[in-house]
Amino acid sequence: MRLFNWRRQAVLNAMPLVKPDQVRTPWHEFWRRFRRQHMAMTAALFVILLIVVAIFARWIAPYDAENYFDYDNLNNGPSLQHWFGVDSLGRDIFSRVLVGAQISLAAGVFAVFIGAAIGTLLGLLAGYYEGWWDRLSMRICDVLFAFPGILLAIAVVAVLGSGIANVIIAVAIFSIPAFARLVRGNTLVLKQQTFIESARSIGASDMTILLRHILPGTVSSIVVFFTMRIGTSIISAASLSFLGLGAQPPTPEWGAMLNEARADMVIAPHVAVFPALAIFLTVLAFNLLGDGLRDALDPKIKG
């Protein structure tokens, strides 16, 4: 008996003591993996800065983006007075790009949010119940996928009319099937797991299973796709505005600014360069951030 107690004590003494602050939660593991990705961290800082600028754009902008006109410096390039130069109407491009961040970012985020909400609901129901609802939902998605996204958005705006609100609706519509298929695939896998069978065996309702067990299992995929989809939505909204179907002059939206700059690109290329650069950097940042989130949330994909 003494020998047994001695051996047990020896084993206990050999076991490393785990301090409370050494216990790693899923959040700690995610942050540890994410902060190692320098490109993703840089993109995250850029996105945070962009959000702050978008929120306070009208206070940060040195001039009124719509009603300020410097007729003495028409089409002048960048200077100390006008950091990004002046357009053909004498408006300060730097101020318009800052305020344009507010409009373009809001359009992209709201469009993806609407598409994600509807698509997630459709995907959960289709993957969980299958049957006729699954077939109907996926056939609708197939029809929407048959059209290029921008053409579908143009068709929707042509029916609803021009304007930034209708652009958000149009971009949201062609985001729905992408989220629906993503969530449906995850749901089909998760519903076969033993913990779902256990939940059913104790009498959990379908709503409880969907919201408390299946939906949390799809959140990481939704977050990653949501982040990357924002870049696509910003490009789509800017493209519609460039074609004259979105934000209308003098609204300082990036796509609308490019549309107005077409006539002066030869004599004043800076008028188009800075709005285009804003679109490029924003889309790149969201894509890099999405890649980083994917690798941090599911390191097996990276491997």
From Swiss-Prot:
Occurrences of domain ABC transmembrane type-1 (ranges): 101-290
Gene from which this protein is expressed: gsiD
Protein name: Glutathione transport system permease protein GsiD
Similarity annotation: Belongs to the binding-protein-dependent transport system permease family.
Claim: Transmembrane helix is one of the keywords in the record: yes
Subunit text: The complex is composed of two ATP-binding proteins (GsiA), two transmembrane proteins (GsiC and GsiD) and a solute-binding protein (GsiB).
Function, in words: Part of the ABC transporter complex GsiABCD involved in glutathione import. Probably responsible for the translocation of the substrate across the membrane.
Keyword check for Zinc-finger: no
Top-level taxon: Bacteria
Keyword terms of this UniProt record: Cell inner membrane, Cell membrane, Membrane, Transmembrane, Transmembrane helix, Transport
Record-annotated membrane-spanning stretches: 40-60, 105-125, 144-164, 165-185, 222-242, 266-286
Membrane disposition: Multi-pass membrane protein
GO CC terms of this entry: plasma membrane
Compartments, record wording: Cell inner membrane
